[in-house]
Design a protein with these regions (language model features):
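TRAFAC-class small GTPase G-domain
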Residues: 1-165
Length: 165
């Protein structure tokens, strides 16, 4: 069996933990609990006959002035960035975070989840923002940890990308 470590990265409160809980346990809670350090979950997925054990490292949300400990990224096969579509600043900080991560581990498969898609009335991102991601070659998937929309697609995409790298 293949094992792949995926790090969940983003600003605090974007829904990293909620996405992992929805994917691994089919659970969602409205209660916010800040992750301290790192929380590790596992889930096996079948990719067309290849079984992959995903080891999901849910890293504590980054504050504006904080750096993520580089040791957390050691052995990572992929990075799953999460931004909150209702909080513009999480999009604005993505590029800085991504640059820092790439400087630490190099160019590994990555994905940006545009999370909280269920809150469309509160969305603060537009087509120009989406195009900015595409222009940089960043793969994006809209997700909702609450409804589950796009969650499995996002995790299966990053799993496939790490296996086929």
């Amino acid at each position: 069996m293949i094992q792949k470590k995926i790090c969940m990265v983003g600003v605090f409160g974007t829904g990293k933990t909620s996405l992992v809980q929805q994917f691994v346990h089919s659970l969602f809670t409205d209660k916010y609990h800040s992750t301290v350090g790192v929380k590790i979950d596992r889930k096996q997925v079948d990719l067309g006959g290849t079984t992959v054990n995903l080891v999901l490292w849910d890293l504590a949300g980054r504050e504006e002035t904080e750096e993520i400990p580089t040791s957390y990224f050691r052995g990572s096969a992929g990075i799953f960035y999460v931004i909150d579509g209702t909080r513009r600043e999480t999009f604005d900080q993505l590029f800085e975070i991504r640059e820092s991560v790439q400087g630490t581990i190099g160019d590994v498969p990555s994905l940006v989840a545009l999370n909280k898609k269920d809150l469309v009335d509160e969305w603060r991102l537009g087509q120009g923002d989406y195009n900015a991601l595409l222009d940089k070659g960043i793969h994006t998937i809209g997700t909702s940890a609450k409804s589950g929309e796009g969650v499995e697609d996002a995790f299966l995409w990053i799993a496939n990308a790490t296996v086929n790298k």
